[in-house]
Curated annotation (Swiss-Prot):
It is an enzyme of class 2 (transferase). The lineage of its organism: Bacteria, Pseudomonadati, Pseudomonadota, Gammaproteobacteria, Pseudomonadales. The gene is dxs. Keywords: Isoprene biosynthesis, Magnesium, Metal-binding, Thiamine biosynthesis, Thiamine pyrophosphate, Transferase. One of its GO terms (molecular function) is 1-deoxy-D-xylulose-5-phosphate synthase activity. Thiamine diphosphate binds at H87, G128, H129, S130, G160, A161, N188, F295, E378. Homodimer. PANTHER family: 1-D-DEOXYXYLULOSE 5-PHOSPHATE SYNTHASE-RELATED, 1-DEOXY-D-XYLULOSE-5-PHOSPHATE SYNTHASE, CHLOROPLASTIC. Its cofactor is Mg(2+); thiamine diphosphate. Belongs to the transketolase family. DXPS subfamily. One of its GO terms (cellular component) is cytosol. Pathway: Metabolic intermediate biosynthesis; 1-deoxy-D-xylulose 5-phosphate biosynthesis; 1-deoxy-D-xylulose 5-phosphate from D-glyceraldehyde 3-phosphate and pyruvate: step 1/1. This is 1-deoxy-D-xylulose-5-phosphate synthase. Its EC number is 2.2.1.7.
Length: 633
């Protein structure tokens, strides 16, 4: 097994057992004694695959044995296996007939980064966001009962995803309907358990066995006839188990808790799953795994090896130096956050488990008492910020656009209705690339601009981002700044913390006939197009409040208005312009460019923008086509 990053195989390894186990049917034809070797081969294959394509890395390495055991014991796809989030699903894809397609992973027209129902019958539920698996599996279990089917429903959820309220809502509901389902907690952070070893594994086998289950149910029937006896016995059992296993919470919710067991011990996994397969009612199995298992660098640094980029062949020529680009937008935010926190002691930073991705590491180290990572709990993050704002704090919620969708009710009910001073720093706005539609920030302008009192800003470069963050921080009420993944155009940055005038756009180029009204980072492309068309370019900056005076001025002096945004056209910033013109009875041809009424599939960001007509060529072609239609070409 490779021990360094550079030892990851560039050529497909020899895997005789995996060659025979390319589907679950083939896997089940292997003997149990062969499965340990299969696990080694699958782990090596995963290293090779992700090295070829890039992608999620550590999570898959941690569930090799669990994935094998699940497909070995259960009759997938008839038994429904639901993976939470999907970061760990690459081994599942390899074992379910997609090994030869893995080279297309996360590429245009290739395999998706996450399980998708349209991709395979083994992908029973599409995922990408966390904490949905238990609810989905519960729905499947109830449907099976209504259909008089004996098929099983299994949810695999990580300890991080289990922190979300949605997961506990499902855990609370399943015992109420006595669902025949299995939840597997993949605990790869030791965040819940410490009792892992021989005793726990032994207990798991005993507690999950049919004999134990039969004795338990028989005792319940006998003792239920004696007043108070069953309750005493139940409490005695609970206390005895509680001394050895950490499952009291799940037992209290009504689950039959088994574990924790070693998630890399295949014989124990298989024996326990076989026992639990035929048990009725809600079953909960706690397995402990190590993220990055089998690859030392990933075991030591699971965060750094959560995902990797594509490896170049060892004999590849030296890559051409990359063009100098600007800093990452998230980095500009992180620096601003520290600067503003030093200047304003009221500032607090909140993130739902995105410290690294949103660049809050430096802030968390410099201002630990003002930094709050609430885990995967977007609803809580928003209302926590609201509560802080009620007491005079100035919260900044750093959150990805796609995840803010999960806290939308709180955004309206708890923040906006009360006009509280909460700034939302919305990262990953627009198209994000290889992770596909589940992670795209396609809708934030649409769902934000309809909220009364909301300040909504779209920077065109790094400097505007910094200025808009200051503007939102000083604003009396809820504010949002949305910015994309990746780097800016290397604009000079004003390090001051001064705001800009609210609701005012800026004309960046004066032209004639055509006016390009840009909301966000497509400004650079618009300026290039404008040089060819002699068009006016307006950096609109604010979606709400819209610079209506500037729109009126531009409409009066141009024959065609073109709005450009990396957001859904429906309900987006362009719609705000059209609504204003209609309200003022201003008749003017207008073309809206943005994201279509469709989910843009995974590809490289440049490919996705081209597909949507938001690259330079696409913008130019659309404008020329409309000019021709209007007889203005």
């Amino acid at each position: 097994m490779p021990t360094t990053f550079h030892e990851i195989p560039r050529k497909r390894p020899t895997t005789p057992l995996l060659d025979r186990a390319q589907t679950p049917d083939g896997l089940r034809r292997l003997g149990e004694a062969e499965l340990e070797t299969l696990a080694d081969e699958l782990r090596l294959e995963l290293l090779y695959t992700v090295g070829q394509t890039g992608g999620h890395f550590g999570a898959g390495l941690g569930v090799i044995e669990l994935t094998i055991a699940l497909h070995y014991v259960f009759d997938t796809p008839d038994d429904r296996l639901v993976w939470d989030v999907g970061h760990q699903a690459y081994p599942h894809k390899i074992l379910t007939g997609r090994r030869e397609q893995m080279a297309s992973l996360r590429q245009k027209d290739g395999l998706a980064a996450f399980p998708r129902r349209s991709e395979s019958e083994y992908d029973t539920f599409g995922v990408g966001h966390s904490s949905t698996s238990i609810s989905a599996a519960l729905g499947m279990a109830i449907a099976a009962r209504l259909q008089n089917s004996e098929r099983k429903a299994i949810a695999v959820i990580g300890d991080g995803a289990l922190t979300a309220g949605m997961a506990f809502e499902a855990l609370n509901h399943a015992p109420e309907v006595d669902a025949n389902m299995l939840v597997i907690l993949n605990d790869n952070d030791m965040s819940i358990s410490r009792n892992v070893g021989g005793l726990s594994n032994y207990l798991a086998k005993i507690l999950s066995s049919r004999t134990y289950a039969s004795m338990r149910e028989g005792s319940k029937k006998v003792l239920s006839r004696l007043p108070g006896a069953w309750e005493i016995a139940r409490r005695t059992e609970e206390y005895a188990k509680g001394m050895l296993v950490p499952g009291t919470l799940f037992e209290e919710l009504g689950w039959n808790y088994i574990g924790p067991i070693d998630g890399h011990d295949l014989p124990t996994l298989i024996a326990t799953l076989r026992n639990m397969r035929d048990l009725k009612g809600p079953q909960f199995l706690h397995v402990v795994t190590k993220k990055g298992k089998g690859f030392a660098p990933a075991e030591v640094d699971p965060i750094g090896y959560h995902a990797i980029t594509k490896l170049e062949p060892l004999d590849a020529p030296a890559a051409a130096p990359k063009k100098a680009g600007g800093p990452k937008y998230s980095g500009v935010f992180g620096e601003w956050l520290c600067d503003m926190a030093a200047a304003d002691p009221r500032l607090v930073g909140i993130t739902p488990a995105m410290k690294e991705g949103s660049d809050l590491v430096a802030f968390s180290e410099r201002f630990p008492l003002r930094y709050f990572d609430v885990a995967i709990a977007e609803q809580h993050a928003v209302t926590l910020a609201a509560g802080m704002a009620c007491e005079g704090a100035k919260p900044v919620v750093a959150i990805y656009s796609t995840f803010l969708q999960r806290g939308y009710d709180q955004l309206i009910h708890d923040v906006a209705v009360q006009n509280l001073d909460v700034l939302f720093a919305i990262d990953r706005a627009g198209l994000v690339g290889e992770d596909g539609p589940t992670h795209a920030g396609s809708f934030d302008l649409s769902y934000l601009r309809c909220i009364p009192g909301m300040l909504v800003m779209t920077p065109s470069d790094e400097n505007e981002l910094r200025m808009m963050l200051s503007t939102g921080h000083l604003y009396n009420g809820p504010a949002a700044v949305r910015y994309p993944r990746g780097t800016g155009p290397n604009a000079p940055i004003d390090k001051s913390l001064e705001p800009i005038e609210i609701g005012k756009g800026v004309i960046r180029r004066q032209g004639r006939q055509v006016a390009l009204l840009v909301f966000g980072v497509q400004l650079a492309e618009a300026l290039q197009v404008a040089e060819k068309l002699d068009a006016t370019v307006v950096d609109m900056r604010f979606v709400k409040p819209l610079d209506e005076a500037l729109v009126r001025e531009i409409a009066s002096s141009h024959e065609l208005l073109v709005t450009i945004e990396e957001n859904a056209i429906m309900g987006g910033a362009g719609g705000a312009v059209s609504e204003y013109l209609a309200r003022e009875n201003i008749l003017k041809p207008i073309l809206h460019l943005g994201l279509p009424d469709a989910y843009v599939e995974h590809a490289k960001p440049a490919q996705m923008l081209a597909e949507c007509g938001l690259d330079e060529a696409g913008i130019e072609a659309s404008v020329r086509q409309r000019l021709a239609l209007l007889g203005l070409a």
